[in-house]
Amino acid sequence: VTYIPFDFERFDDRTDYYNYFGQPDIVIHLAWEGLPNYRSSFHEEINLPRHYSFLTNLIKNGLPDLTVAGTCFEYGMQEGCLKEDMPVLPANPYGKAKDSLRRRLEEFKGNYPFSLKWVRLFYMYGKGQNPNSLLSQLDRALANKEQVFNMSGGEQIRDFLPVEKVAENIVSIALQRNIDGVINNCSGNPVTVKQFVERYLQLNNKTIALNLGFYPYPDYEPMKFWGDTSKLKKVVNNE
């Protein structure tokens, strides 16, 4: 693996970044600053133009194939099973910025032909996760031998996927050439947050009392949603 340094704050559109990065056949773009502060204006005011300028520079200079990480927050407050062909109604600055980036890149295809795969990520967990994420907090409570773990009511329904599987799916999506556009990267299995925590404890042979309802439910995401995996399965199974 060759690591090539790049600082977004020193971006210069006069530079040919496609050549700088060794003229890659495919780029998988995962970078995005400021998370998990989903409601910060930073996403639209700074991240959106910054990442659009960088990606279009690559494309203008010859990049033929681009895969970008999107987010389930592009669907907004819609509930139930979320499919890629549904209208998007992002309700927070992070979701709005990602949706705007996707739309602008799709418009850019009118000037420069390239393959665009937009991977909508749902809820990931595993090695390297944010220290303030649910399981990170739970692991700390267990390590500290705490008797009680404070959490929300736990009845919200989510779609969880191990980060290793998320990465595997992203690579499969990026390498194939049959399906472009938006692709959900999720399990397709709805589960309550309470069930998710209980299963995690069971798998790790751990016990701790769950103080349900200590935290309010987030107001920036719907109560019950999960992803449709029909399109993802076609990619993974080479259909």
Across the structure, where does each feature detected by a protein language model lie?
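Hydrophobic/aromatic anchor residues within beta-strands of the central parallel beta-sheet
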Residues: 3, 66, 116-119
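NAD(P)H-binding glycine-rich loop region in Rossmannoid oxidoreductase-like domains
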Residues: 8-47
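NAD(P)-dependent short-chain dehydrogenase/reductase
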Residues: 103-158, 163-167, 171-172, 199-201
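Active-site beta-alpha turn of Rossmann-fold NAD(P)-dependent dehydrogenases/reductases
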Residues: 31, 67-71, 91, 120-122, ...
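Conserved Rossmann-fold NAD(P)-dependent oxidoreductase catalytic core, especially the SDR/UDP-sugar
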Residues: 29, 52-93
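C-terminal substrate-binding subdomain of Rossmann-fold SDR/epimerase-dehydratase oxidoreductases
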Residues: 144-239
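Active-site helix of classical SDR
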Residues: 93, 97-100
